[in-house]
Design a protein with these regions (language model features):
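Short amphipathic coiled-coil heptad-repeat segments
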Residues: 1-22, 178, 183-222, 391-409
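Short, solvent-exposed loop/turn positions at domain surfaces
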Residues: 4, 24, 69-72, 145, ...
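A short glycine-rich beta-alpha junction/loop motif
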Residues: 10-14, 88, 104-109, 143-167, ...
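Non-catalytic DNA-recognition/assembly elements of restriction-modification systems
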Residues: 13-41, 212-236
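Sequence-specific dsDNA recognition surfaces
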Residues: 31-42, 46-80, 106, 226-236, ...
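A short beta-sheet element
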Residues: 62, 74-132, 145, 272-333, ...
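Short, surface-exposed secondary-structure boundary micro-motifs
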Residues: 89, 175-177, 285, 378-380
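Short, solvent-exposed linear patches
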Residues: 168-171, 373-374
C-alpha cells in the first residue's frame, strides 16, 4: 500500500503491512519518545570504553586498536537500550540504540537518551533505516565547512515520527531483529571462514599440509620469481580507459567503482596496460598486507595501472597461474620481500622494493603439475565456500534493507 497522508497530516500508512493491521500510523514528536540523561563516570576506567559509529556500537579497541588515550573520567555511562546520537556526524547516520553491550561508557561528545512510549526494538531497527537518516538530516543546517552540519536540537525534538500500534510495533521489530541476528551470525561465519581459509593457505604453502598421497609426493622446488614470471611493461595507449586499483576483497577492480572520485590521472597513456590473467604488485602497505599485495586481473579483459605497480605474467609451462594466485594470497612470499626491503624503507606507506630485487625473490612451490592442480582444486573449493557465504550475507542484507524502506514511513 502506498504512503497515504490524512487530511490533517498527522496520520499515514506505510507501503508494507502485516496482515490484520490497517489503522494509520500516528505522528509523535521525537522529543516525546526520548529523554536525555548524562550519568557521568567519577573515576578513570570506571567501565568499558565504547564508540558509536555509522555501522553500530563498538568497543573502542575494535575501532582504534588501543584502549586509553586521554582521560575518560567524566565520560557518559550507558546501558542496554540507550540511544546514542553523534553531535558531529548525525547527518551521516551516526545514530544508534545500544543492543550489543549490557553497559559501558562513551565520550561526552555523544548525546545519550532513554527511550519510552514505544518499542525500543522498533526504534533500534528504525534508526538504521533510510527514513531515519532523512529524519536526522532534516534537523541539521550547514556548518562551518561543507563537510560539517550543525544539529538543530529543538527542530529534531519537534519533528514527528510516525508509529503504529504497539502490537504492530512488536511485529515489525521481531521480524527485523530476526534478520539482524541472522546477519550478525552470517558475519561471524564469514570471519571464521576467512580465518580458516588463511590458516589452510599458510599450511599448504608451508608444506605442513600436503594434498597428494605420501608415495606420490615430490620435493618442492625453489624458484626465483623470474623463473616462473615475466615482467609486463607494455604501455597503455588508448586500448583501455579502466583505471585499476587493488581491493583486498575483490582484487584488481575499476578505481571508479572503488572511490567516490577518480584517483588516477585522467590521462592514462603512460600507465601499464594489464591484460586479464596478469598480476600486479602494489607496494603500499596496510595492516592486512604488511608487505603490499599481489593480485591477478580477473574482472576485465584489460585495464591500466600506475607505473608504481610491478606487473608480471606467469609462465604457465613452469607454474600454474591459479597456483600463483593462491600462493600470493598466503604470506609465504613475504620473506623474500623482507630480505630485499631495508628496515624502515617506507615512503608514506610505500615499500622501497627494487624491481630487480623483486624478480629475484625466491619462492618454494610444488614442481609436480599434478600436485599443483591438487592444490588449486582444494584452495579453489575453500574460496568458493567463502564467496558463497558472502553472497548469502549480501542477500540477507538486501532483504532487510528492502523491508526497512517499506515498513517505515
Amino acid at each position: 500500500m502506498a504512503n497515504v497522508s490524512s487530511s490533517n497530516g498527522l496520520e499515514k500508512r506505510p507501503k508494507l503491512r502485516f496482515p490484520g493491521f490497517d489503522e494509520p500510523w500516528k505522528a509523535t514528536a521525537f522529543g516525546d519518545l526520548v529523554h536525555e540523561f548524562s550519568n557521568r563516570t567519577k573515576v578513570e576506567d570506571e567501565d568499558v570504553l565504547l564508540s558509536a559509529a555509522i555501522e553500530g556500537m563498538f568497543l573502542n579497541t575494535e575501532l582504534f586498536g588501543h584502549q586509553r588515550g586521554a582521560s575518560n573520567k567524566g565520560y557518559k555511562k550507558i546501558k542496554y537500550g540507550t540511544m546514542v546520537l553523534s553531535t558531529q556526524n548525525l547527518h551521516l547516520g551516526n545514530a544508534n540504540v545500544n543492543q550489543r553491550f549490557e553497559h559501558g561508557m562513551v565520550s561526552p561528545a555523544y548525546k545519550t537518551y532513554d527511550i519510552s512510549g514505544c518499542s525500543i526494538d522498533l526504534i533500534a531497527q528504525w534508526i538504521k533505516s533510510d527514513a531515519a537518516k532523512r529524519f536526522f538530516y532534516n534537523a541539521t543546517t550547514v556548518g562551518a565547512s561543507v563537510c560539517r552540519r550543525n544539529v538543530e536540537w529543538d527542530t529534531l525534538y519537534g519533528q514527528s515520527l510516525f508509529l503504529p500500534s504497539l502490537p504492530e510495533q512488536e511485529k515489525i521489530a521481531n521480524l527485523l531483529t530476526l534478520l539482524s541476528n541472522r546477519i550478525e551470525k552470517q558475519r561471524q561465519l564469514i570471519i571464521a571462514l576467512k580465518k580458516y581459509k588463511r590458516g589452510v593457505f599458510e599450511a599448504v604453502f608451508s608444506q605442513k599440509l600436503r594434498l597428494v598421497p605420501t608415495e606420490l609426493q615430490k620435493p618442492w622446488k625453489q624458484y626465483k620469481l623470474s623463473d616462473f614470471a615475466t615482467r609486463v611493461t607494455r604501455k597503455n595507449g588508448n586500448q583501455t580507459d579502466i583505471p585499476l586499483t587493488i581491493s583486498a576483497q575483490y582484487g584488481l577492480i575499476d578505481q571508479r567503482d572503488f572511490f567516490s572520485k577518480m584517483v588516477a590521472s585522467t590521462d592514462m597513456s603512460g600507465y601499464y596496460l594489464l591484460q586479464k590473467g596478469e598480476f600486479a604488485y602494489n607496494r603500499s602497505t596496510s595492516n592486512e598486507y604488511p608487505f603490499g599485495s599481489i593480485k591477478r586481473l580477473e574482472l576485465y579483459p584489460m585495464g591500466a595501472v600506475s607505473t608504481l605497480y610491478l606487473c608480471f605474467a606467469i609462465k604457465e609451462e613452469v607454474v600454474n597461474s591459479d597456483l600463483a594466485k593462491w600462493y600470493f594470497e598466503s604470506s609465504q612470499w613475504y620473506k623474500g620481500i623482507n630480505n630485499i626491503c631495508a628496515e624502515g624503507a617506507r615512503n608514506h606507506g610505500l615499500l622501497n622494493v627494487p624491481t630487480d630485487g623483486f624478480f629475484n625473490t625466491v619462492h618454494t612451490l610444488p614442481s609436480d603439475p599434478n600436485e599443483q592442480l591438487a592444490v588449486v582444486d582444494y584452495l579453489s573449493n575453500i574460496q568458493k565456500k567463502y564467496e558463497a557465504a558472502q553472497r548469502c550475507l549480501q542477500a540477507i542484507e538486501n532483504l532487510r534493507s528492502g523491508l526497512l524502506q517499506q515498513l517505515f514511513i
